[in-house]
C-alpha cells in the first residue's frame, strides 16, 4: 500500500487545479527498480497518457496512478511534503523496496557481500567520485576489494577501508572476517585526496 500525506495531496491538488485539464492525475513509477540507481518518478498524467493497467489510488481531488510494473517495488512507499532549508518545502518519496530486497541468510556469502557493496557502500563513495569492486571473497570470509574512481590513489583509502567499509561489511554480513585492499593506488588518476595530502 502507498501512503500519501494530506499535505502532499493538497500540494498535488493545487497544482492539478492550476493546469485546468479535466481528469488529470499524478502517475508514480519506479525507474531502474532493483538496482542501486533505482528512483521514483512522479509526473502529471492526463487521461490520454494512461495505459489502463495502472493501479488507481483515490486521493483528495485527484487520482494517483501507480505504473503496473512498479507496484511491487513501490509497495510501502510514503509520499510527503517536508520542511526544507530556509523555510522551503520539499517533496519526499520513501520507497523502501525500490532498490530490491537484501539477500536472505540462505544466500551465499558472495551474494550478500555484493549486495551491501552495491547498495550501501558504493552510493556513499560516489559522493567523492569513488567506487569499490569486489574482487574475491574467500572461503574464510576475507573480502578482497579494488578501489576505483576518486578512491583509487586517495590518501584516505586506508581509513575508508578500515573505519567505513570493513566496519559496515562485518556488521551487516555475518561470515565476513576481514576486508583487504587489492588496489594499485599508484595508478590512480584523480584521487579525491592525493596521497601525502591526507590529514
UniProtKB/Swiss-Prot annotation:
Domain of life: Bacteria
Cofactor: [4Fe-4S] cluster
Cofactor note: Binds 1 [4Fe-4S] cluster per subunit. The cluster is presumably bound at the interface of two monomers.
UniProt keyword Zinc, yes or no: no
Keyword Metal-binding attributed: yes
Alphabetically ordered keywords of this record: 4Fe-4S, Iron, Iron-sulfur, Metal-binding
InterPro entries: Fe/S_biogenesis_protein_NfuA, FSCA_dom_sf, HesB-like_dom_sf, NIF_FeS_clus_asmbl_NifU_C
An individual GO BP term: iron-sulfur cluster assembly
Residue numbers binding [4Fe-4S] cluster: 151, 154
GO MF assignments: 4 iron, 4 sulfur cluster binding; iron ion binding
PANTHER family noted in UniProt: FE_S BIOGENESIS PROTEIN NFUA, IRON-SULFUR CLUSTER SCAFFOLD PROTEIN NFU-RELATED
SUBUNIT field: Homodimer.
Protein family: Belongs to the NfuA family.
Summary of the function given for this chain in its UniProt record: Involved in iron-sulfur cluster biogenesis. Binds a 4Fe-4S cluster, can transfer this cluster to apoproteins, and thereby intervenes in the maturation of Fe/S proteins. Could also act as a scaffold/chaperone for damaged Fe/S proteins.
Record protein name field: Fe/S biogenesis protein NfuA
Species for this entry: Stenotrophomonas maltophilia (strain K279a)
Source lineage: Bacteria, Pseudomonadati, Pseudomonadota, Gammaproteobacteria, Lysobacterales
Amino acid at each position: 500500500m502507498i501512503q500519501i500525506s494530506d499535505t502532499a495531496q493538497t500540494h498535488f491538488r493545487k497544482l492539478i487545479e492550476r493546469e485546468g485539464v479535466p481528469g488529470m492525475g499524478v502517475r508514480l513509477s519506479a525507474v531502474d527498480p532493483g538496482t542501486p540507481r533505482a528512483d521514483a518518478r512522479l509526473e502529471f498524467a492526463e487521461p490520454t497518457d494512461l495505459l489502463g493497467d495502472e493501479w488507481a489510488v483515490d486521493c483528495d481531488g485527484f487520482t494517483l496512478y501507480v505504473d503496473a510494473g512498479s507496484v511491487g517495488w513501490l509497495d510501502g512507499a510514503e509520499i510527503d511534503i517536508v520542511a526544507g532549508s530556509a523555510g522551503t518545502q520539499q517533496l519526499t518519496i520513501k520507497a523502501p523496496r525500490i532498490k530490491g530486497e537484501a539477500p536472505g541468510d540462505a544466500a551465499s556469502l558472495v551474494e550478500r557481500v555484493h549486495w551491501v557493496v552495491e547498495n550501501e557502500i558504493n552510493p556513499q563513495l560516489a559522493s567523492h567520485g569513488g567506487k569499490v569492486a569486489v574482487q574475491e571473497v574467500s572461503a574464510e570470509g576475507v573480502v578482497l576489494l579494488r578501489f576505483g574512481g576518486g578512491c583509487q590513489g586517495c590518501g584516505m583509502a586506508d581509513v575508508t577501508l578500515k573505519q567505513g567499509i570493513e566496519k559496515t561489511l562485518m556488521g551487516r554480513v555475518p561470515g565476513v572476517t576481514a576486508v583487504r585492499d587489492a588496489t594499485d593506488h599508484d595508478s590512480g588518476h584523480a584521487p579525491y585526496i592525493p596521497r601525502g595530502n591526507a590529514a
